[in-house]
Design a protein with these regions (language model features):
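Long, low-complexity segments enriched in small/aliphatic residues
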Residues: 1, 186-244
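Non-catalytic alpha/beta scaffold blocks inside enzyme catalytic domains
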Residues: 1-201
Length: 244
């Protein structure tokens, strides 16, 4: 019953996200996690339920990174109608595609669509370094072949910039600022994919001696997910990749 190890993975994840702020006395900041409940009309927030939630006005904004749901989704007409109800839409991709331009489709008056659309220029896979995973179950590390053109940036840089801006904003004010303000977000001035990969794998937070006498110094990477712990002495952004 491998599920008995869930506390080890959850605590290690919380330590990765909130670092020194995640302590045993505050349940490792478990309360910082958003609670989705049963989702939209009890259907969760899978793709179709997410679309209906936008259509109903429950979801006000949407980020689309490297995807084109207006073309790739199951019901293009429904998806476009749902996006008509958004306050804002952020698309990060190589070019303006059908999702980014949903508001100027034939037969529609753009002036009647209130959605504010932001198109962020992401660079291509050969213009950045980092790992990829996909539905074909690939896990690859790719090196940068050429520099990004014009103002395009790796999507990691885009997310990093957004996160840092949010942290600065929540330092000043907010109804419930701690989950953002206390984030352990330090991947360098320009986000380093190696730091992200190291966090995903995980490391020991303090010096640890295991039952068999093996010693691991604080900062050393955890060699396998079976060695993650639920006492706050390890951190791992994704236990599946631990030791990979």
């Amino acid at each position: 019953n491998w599920l008995q190890n869930t506390p080890k993975y959850v605590v290690s994840l919380l330590k990765a996200w909130w670092g020194e702020n995640a302590k045993s006395e505050n349940d490792f900041d478990f309360a910082h996690l958003p609670k989705l409940g049963r989702g939209f009309q009890g259907q969760g927030y899978a793709f179709l339920a997410l679309t209906h939630a936008m259509l109903a006005g429950e979801i006000k904004g949407l980020f689309c990174f490297g995807q084109n749901p207006v073309v790739g989704g199951a019901n293009a007409r429904l998806i476009r109608a749902a996006m008509d109800k958004l306050d804002w839409l952020v698309v990060a991709d190589l070019f303006e595609h059908e999702t980014a331009g949903f508001w100027k489709r034939p037969g529609i008056d753009p002036a009647r669509i209130p959605t504010e659309v932001f198109v962020l220029p992401a660079c291509s896979g050969v213009e950045k370094e980092g790992s990829i995973v996909n539905s074909g179950r690939w896990v690859q590390w790719r090196n940068q072949a050429v520099k990004p053109i014009a103002d395009s940036r790796p999507d990691l840089d885009i997310v990093d910039g957004l996160a840092k801006a949010m942290k600065r904003t929540y330092e000043k004010d907010g109804v419930f600022p701690d989950p953002i303000r206390q984030l352990a977000w330090d991947y360098g001035d320009h986000a380093d994919p190696h730091r992200v990969a190291r966090e995903l794998n995980g490391s020991f937070v303090v010096d640890v001696t295991e039952k068999d006498g093996k010693e691991f110094a604080a900062g050393k990477q955890v060699p396998a997910f079976a060695q993650l712990r639920d006492d706050g002495s390890t951190m791992s952004g994704n236990w599946i990749y631990c030791g990979g």
